[in-house]
Amino acid sequence: MSVSSNDPEQRNGRGMASGNNVDMSLYPPFIKQLDAKLPDYTREGDIEYPFEEITGVGDENRIRGNWSNKSDYLLAVIGFTAGVGSFWKFPFLVFQHGGAAFLVPYLCMLCLASLPMFFMEMVLGQFSSSAAISVWKVVPLFKGIGFAQVTISGFFAVFFNIISAWTLFYLINSFSFSIPWSNCANSWSGENCTLGTRIQCKEMNGTLLVNGSCIVEHASSNETTVIPLHDLGSIPSLKYFHNDVLMLSKGVDDFGTLNWYLGLCVLACWIAVFLCLFQGVKSSGKVVYVAVIVPFIILTVLLTRLLTLDGSLAAVFYFLTPKWEILMDLHVWGEAAVQAFYSVSCCSGGLFTIASYSRFHNNIYKDIWLVLIVDVIVSLVGCLLTFSAIGFTCYEFAISLDKFHIRDGFHLVFVFLAEALAGVSVAPLYAGLFFIMILLVVHATQMFVVETIVSSICDEYPERLRRNRRHVLTTVCALFILLSIPFCLSSGLFWMELLTQFVLTWPLVVIAFLECMAINWVYGVDNMLDNAKWIVGYWPPCYIFWKILFKFICPMVYLAILCFLWLDWNSIQYESYQFPYWSILTAWCIASFPLILIPIVGIWQFCIAKGTITQKWWRVLYPDDAWGPAMAIHRAEKFPLQIPEARRLLLPPEVEIASSRGVLQEEMPMSYDYNTSSAADVRSNRSTGHGATDVRSVAATNNTIPKFERETAI
């Protein structure tokens, strides 16, 4: 039917005559009623002014903001994912499990456990321009996952802040002619402080044997004494960490005193985070140039220096010599799966947040592979750095590599690597560089963890809080300063161990499984991949592989990781100290708290949904009407009739359009299978090479709808 009039005055307020039937193919399949009660445009709403010309200059989304450029965005993702785990966990696993052979299960699990979740969170965050809570408009019943992620991000914020404070404490004390932990002549050294075997034997004017013993000749009696030096006491870096930095108490129930110097470091780190986030992604996007690029430069300098030390090359060759028999050990595969899952910081909400500030049509496929490759490279370079230090330490203590044992976590960074750097010439310089690198790496991660919390809160309540973002940031930082104070007590290390072993481990895997089921089974894997196509313009390569991976392999992998974590769990201890039962029970309760929010919020969403019981289930299992691109110009690329201004352009009053499904969405029977229908549409889209509901394709085939151009303005 031809269009005889385009006069907007002849139409009603929503651009359509009453009584007309509308082709529902121009609506998203989850819109449940004709007009969807779309609100008019406001500056604090979720939809930007429609059809605004996009030139690539300035913010695309002027309400929420965007990254200033692509490099800001990429460095932010790299800074968030390539964290301190590349220096204190991955090298330990490689050393314990067959050297380079461990890379085989690690890379396999990286593709099966990390890549799918990384892809999914980046796509949904960029597609909806929403942070961790608001993104769950996609499946309102599972909105509690967003609250759980924000809660876990709060734990991460405190955790990384304490690590930053410890690092800052070390950094400040590195600015001296002789770093404190290089010798035992200190008040905190204690009785069992032991220097390196070669140094100690040299001080006694002895001769070092191959087995690590020292022969000392006594001039007065012409006798010799053999001393097994490497069996003595503790190295000074461990004494320094326990007695000076932490003022460590006897146990978790012995709170001790507050370390005021450490408390000031905590305050300084939180002030730094506040200043970096004060202007949102505009300021944090500039900080990452220092927080991400400088650590790479320092890492190169440190690696070059350590490779020149005695014994370092032997350890590197030890690393490069694979022990293939470990591939038959299921425990090694379990460790690789756990490390691969945590290596890209999935399921804490940070990836949703970072991706939400990128431009809508940013090519996310290339970004995902680039970030994963950089993450692997950083982990490998971290391994080389650690193995070089191991070789040098074994040389100093006259211990063979096969008999050398290290601990992961805090000990690897603050004890072992600190001890290795203390033996290098010009030690204060290299120790200072090392702790600057660790401080910047941890700060970059903490910065975006806090940004996740702030953005999630502001996105969930935009009318009240988006204009007052700085007030939200101030409140969040002040709250976390108070929560960080208990970790500055003498028992702080024990609580950090509990936090590491319980709160920041298995709850993330539970969230990953629920998130995977909600997106790939409830929302539909086809719809998620269609969102990716909407962003980039083409389907991800190997579409069938991705579909099988998301829908079937990922849930099984996450369940396997969860079972491994629970079955492999042993009674937690720190050195010889056994944690009491009540502290472990407390840690379990804290770890379970974020997960309890998921059913609570789900029940709340069901209760506030309107309609009968069946209609309530319909509303909480299907995407909210507001789900989709944040800007109207992007929504209008496929569903122009969802935008009031577009309806005034596209629908003259006399046009008679029939529903494509024969019934309106509000009259749709509750037995209608949304996922099946949309999946069929998606498969049709793939076969034709374009979206079935793309406005340009509709305009070309339907004479009743005028051609819509992206640059059209009202």
Curated annotation (Swiss-Prot):
What PROSITE patterns does the record point to?
A: NA_NEUROTRAN_SYMP_1, NA_NEUROTRAN_SYMP_2, NA_NEUROTRAN_SYMP_3
Where are the Cytoplasmic topological domains?
Answer: 1-74, 605-714
**What does altering residue 144 to D do?**
In allele eg114; exaggerated bending of the anterior body and head, and mild hypercontraction. Elevated concentrations of acetylcholine at the NMJ
One Pfam family recorded for the sequence: SNF
User: Quick one: a GO biological-process term for this protein?
Assistant: sodium ion transmembrane transport
Which GO MF term does the entry hold, naming one? acetylcholine transmembrane transporter activity
- The protein's superkingdom reads Eukaryota
Give the span(s) annotated as Disordered.
1-21
Per the record, ranges on the Extracellular side are 173-257
Q: Which residues are glycosylated?
A: 192, 205, 211, 222
Tissues and organs where the protein is expressed, per its UniProt entry: Body wall, and vulval and enteric muscles.
GO cellular component assignments = plasma membrane; postsynaptic membrane
Which cellular compartments is it found in? Cell membrane; Postsynaptic cell membrane
- InterPro entries xref list: Na/ntran_symport, SNS_sf
Q: Could you tell me what this protein does? A: Mediates sodium-dependent uptake of acetylcholine at neuromuscular junctions during periods of increased synaptic activity, may also prevent spillover to adjacent synaptic sites. Not involved in the uptake of other neurotransmitters (GABA, glycine, proline and glutamate) and there was also no inhibition of uptake by adding an excess of other candidate substrates (GABA, glycine, taurine, creatine, proline, alanine, carnitine, glutamate and betaine).
Provide the family line: Belongs to the sodium:neurotransmitter symporter (SNF) (TC 2.A.22) family.
Which PANTHER family has this protein been placed in?
SODIUM-DEPENDENT NUTRIENT AMINO ACID TRANSPORTER 1-RELATED, SODIUM/CHLORIDE DEPENDENT TRANSPORTER
Q: What is the name attached to this protein's record? A: Sodium-dependent acetylcholine transporter
Per the record, the gene is snf-6
